[in-house]
Every structure is written in structure tokens, then in C-alpha cells.
């Protein structure tokens, strides 16, 4: 008797219809946020390179806040430490949901985006380190490891509107894991000093916040003061204050408890909070941070050349444009090789390359890590900002070229994905999903 052939599974398998709709809504909001992020960046660069650049710098250094709480911060610091805490709160909500009820709850499904994200962090970091061997810029190794999903989706909205849902889901999940790795790096690597008492004190409001949300309390007059107290104490401890946002996000339950009717009674509080806070994060917090962080004086082509001649800047550009796609491609290929996974019909490795290059758009978190590594406003931080902008622009242009070449194929695949012959509001491919999809990794 002949051997039964091994079952293969898809690298980018299609999810359920409700999950596909949820992801589509997230992508739509992030794409809008990406447009606002781009506008804020252009405005900051224009102002910083105008005859009125001194007023921009004065605004950045304007201080406000209570000195008794050590919160007399500049506007730029409030944007980085305060507003980005909202971004990381939403990231925490999304991470927990993915681990409890999303793609990352199944190790077999999670393997592709998790390993791809790890490759996309490790290779740029190694490449940066090699460029800066023996130099004084080794602290910036983590700068080119981040992916800015909002910017990436803004690019997709222009050149890849017909991208198949499996590829979109892969990009989003990869970015979620990327955020988790960035959070760990910021907390572990870029904590300069640690004060134990404030850190222990932060556990009290965090525990009260957790207790309330576990009981499905939504009253913001109760939750916001506890969140603010947690943020203040984490900030005072020396750990970057954005970590408080992640911890608060992790505290929110994903599934309803039995007292609230169980998971069958509807979405948990995490989805409710994510729906409320994502527009504020993508549409307000991140663009304002970009406005305060991206405004660097370039001084023409000579200034651009001088900035990019800095080995730190060169390492960032190479990490984003070369290291990021190389790491993602290598990890994804190895997963496919060792698990005998296949690409969906109509897809090729060129499509994976397009997404891997797109993931080289590292902006928000890259700028934040640059400030933590070299100090906000320092000459090297300015060089890094120019490098992040240059590398992200190059990655966007290269991804646009690759994905544009495949747009006709994507249009055909999207037509097949959206076909609804029985007119019941659910595309046929999602109704057939449970009958046609093999179990992954047997």
C-alpha cells in the first residue's frame, strides 16, 4: 500500500467571517490614523525647516506639569511618555485578545507571525550592531526593529487595497507581536535607573483597576484616576511610562465571566475598550507624538548626507530596508520548509517579500527608542530621526513597487473572496471554510 501523503496547511489561512470583519475594521481605522500620522510628520518637518524653526523648538521645550510629582515635563516629553501610553494601552488590549481569543492562542497558527516577527527584530538588530562595531552608538541597536502598522496600512490604502485577507491578517498579527517585543525591549533595555518603592506603589492602583474591570465596571470617573496613578508611579520608578499603558491593557478581560453570561453573551470588555480607544490612539495620540518627535532640521542635501554618514544612521537605514525584510522572509521560509506549509492558490513568495519590505516602515516606536537610546534633542538623535524617515520612505517605495506588480492578481483574489452567490451577506469562501481547511500541522 502507498503511503498517505502528508497533510499540508496554508501559511496565511483565512479566518472566520466575524474575525475577518473585525480585522477589516481595525485596518480601516489604522489606515486613517496613518494618513493623519503622515500629515503630522510633514507639518513637523516643514515647520522645523522653515524660517520659523526656532518657534518649533521653543514649543517642544515648553514645560508644564506639577514639579512636586516630578511631572514638570516638556511638551515633547508629555507626547512621548503620556500620549504614547494610550497607544500602548490599545496595544496591550490587542495583544491580550490575540493570546486569549485570537490567532496567537493556537501555537500552531501563531508560529508563522511570531517567528516572522522575531526574525524581523533579530536581523535588523544584528545588522545595526555589525555596522556599529567598535563605535559609540551601540545603544541604538533596537531602533530598526519596529514596524509602524499605521504607516504601513496607509501605504496599503494607496497601493494595495485589494490585498487578500490572509496577507492582511498576517501583517496585522506580525505587527502585534512586534509591539510586544518592542515593549519588552523598552522595559528591560532602556530603564536607566530603577526606584523600587514607586514601582511597588504602582501595583496598588493597578490592582484596583484590575478588580474593577474584572467586574465589568466601565465608569471612567473611577478607572481614569486609577490609570493616571499607575502611570505616574511607573514614571517615577524610572521604567518608561508607556509600560504602564501595556499593563493596564493586560488587566482588561477579553472574555465575559460566568456572572456576565460567559463568552456566548457577547464580546468582553477588552473589545469594548479597544473600540473606544483605538480612534483616540490612531487619530490623536500617535499623530501628535509624530508632530513633536519628527520635526528635525535637515539643512538640505548637505545636511542629509552628513546625517546619513553617521554609522548609527546608516545602521538604522540598513536595518529597516534590508534587515527587516530579510529577517521576516528567512523566518517565514524556514517555517514553510520545516512544516511543509504552502502558500494559498494565486500567491507567491513575491507577495511575502512585498509585506516583509512594507514591515520595514518603522516610525513611531523607532523614534521613541531613538530618543531613549541617545537622548531627545541630541545631535545623534536628530541623525537617527533622519535615518528613520529615510529608511521608512525607502521601504514604502520598494513595497509599493513589489505590491503594484501583483495588484491585478490581488484584484482577482479579492473578487473570489467577496463573492456571495446566495446573497446572505456572508461571502461564500467563509461559509465553506470549515469544510475545506485542513487542520494545521496534523
Swiss-Prot record:
Pfam families xrefs: Na_H_antiport_1
One term of GO molecular function: sodium:proton antiporter activity
Basic and acidic residues bias: start-end ranges: 423-435
Chain residue ranges for the region called Disordered: 423-442
Annotated TM spans: 32-52, 73-93, 111-131, 139-159, 170-190, 193-213, 234-254, 284-304, 316-336, 352-372, 383-403
InterPro entries the record matches: Na/H_antiporter_dom_sf, NhaA
Annotated localization: Cell membrane
Membrane topology: Multi-pass membrane protein
GO cellular component: plasma membrane
Catalytic activity: Na(+)(in) + 2 H(+)(out) = Na(+)(out) + 2 H(+)(in)
Gene3D superfamilies, A to Z: Na+/H+ antiporter like domain
Principal location listed in the UniProt entry: membrane
Gene Ontology terms: biological process: regulation of pH
Keywords noted in UniProt: Antiport, Cell membrane, Ion transport, Membrane, Sodium, Sodium transport, Transmembrane, Transmembrane helix, Transport
Function: Na(+)/H(+) antiporter that extrudes sodium in exchange for external protons.
Similarity field: Belongs to the NhaA Na(+)/H(+) (TC 2.A.33) antiporter family.
Name of the protein this chain belongs to: Na(+)/H(+) antiporter NhaA
Top-level taxonomy: Bacteria, Bacillati, Actinomycetota, Actinomycetes, Frankiales
